[in-house]
Amino acid sequence: MTALTASEDLSDDLQSVIFDFLGSDSGSSFDGRTTPPEKAIGRQRSGEKLSMADLRFVKSLGSGDIGSVYLAEVKRSSGGFLVAAAKVMDKRELAARDKEGRARAEREILEDLDHPFLPRLYGSAEDGRWSVLLTEFCPGGDLHILRQLQPLKRFDEASVRFYVSEVVVAMEYMHVRGIIYRDLKPENVLIGSDGHVMLTDFDLSLKSSSSSSPAFAGSPTSDITSAVSCLAPAISCFHRRLRWPRFRRRRTLPEFMSEPVNVRSNSFVGTHEYLAPEIVSGEGHGSAVDWWTLGVFMFELLYGFTPFTGESNHLWNNLKQSMKMRHVTDFDMMTLANIVARGVVFPKEPTVSDAAKDLIRGLLAKDPDRRLGATLGAPVIKRHRFFDGVNWALIRCVSPPHVPPAFKTVDFSKDVYDDSGLDMPVEFY
């Protein structure tokens, strides 16, 4: 999928710095164990300030618009090293491209996150040229690569329910914190060592000056556990089962409703195939765009492609003439035209349940005011029949459909781009 802001390669200077950090050692000192970084550098909300001398970059993991990510060894105060994902940004390039605000916003958002499905900022380091953010390393790669490994390059419905439900919980938390994600796509959903998701890449996210003040609304239910709002699921799977009375009256329990997030934007940002109609048309947008992207995300996991991918039609030319986008391809313009004017069409194959299709239709409503979740937030999405049987309070206790193999020691003395030592054809972030 084409991002609106094109990724750029690392400068030669940064490459030389990375290789300088590699040094002349014969191999990596990483022992293959995924020791939680917080044990060595602390889980402080602001992240610990480290020296560049504490870092050793050992492998390229990927690149984005404002920086590149490396697998890095972080020197432990007790001796030895631990592994982390290091996002390296060239401060001169950020200034030249007017991207300093995006880098600063991502840092502030990472500092604010405290949720099992979202990354924590473990630490940072910088000098006169480079700025580095250290977050948790996810050895399972991302959902885009994992989808490529599935039969027919798509997930079964049970797997989709698992991944979508965890994404809903993560975005619900962000909305409560006043954050609009704006960049949901399989490439940005990582798989942790336990098989659960972790959303990443927040440089396109938008944060309100103040967190949302969640309203409370009653929800009649006959099962207390089903109504728990899973903003930060942390209930142990090993507690003794509570004994509830066999007969109990229906009661009304409070639910968090954080929508809409108190911030609006007219920015044209995101990945083409995931853009909401209100972004394409330039009408201004709010948190409802995240629920649109959830619909596109769910469709892609089920069918293996996005619902509005550019095809030959007569709409895109008018749209292109009315919008000043010199760097947007005709294919992308057709995609944008489809987003604005074409309804979602479900293929005959594979067979997908009516509940899944109904949820996607609700999320892909063109009018953001009528979009599922736009006004009542995640609780109304959670109550959709597609999620029947999901215990939101114990969502972390569900067995994932895929658990990555234990991360093994790799000979990092090889070229930084040599992936031949990996057991699986996945990208690491």
Stretches found by the model and what they are:
Residues 68-93:
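Glycine-rich ATP phosphate-binding loop
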Residues 1-52:
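Intrinsically disordered, low-complexity regulatory segments that flank or precede the catalytic domain
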Residues 57-69:
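Protein kinase glycine-rich loop
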Residues 163-164:
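Activation segment signature within eukaryotic-like protein kinase domains
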Residues 215-250, 257, 374-429:
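C-terminal regulatory tails of eukaryotic serine/threonine kinases
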Residues 123-124:
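A short, aromatic-enriched beta-strand patch in the conserved N-lobe beta-sheet
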Residues 119, 128-136, 144-145:
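A conserved loop-to-beta-strand element in the N-lobe of protein kinase catalytic cores
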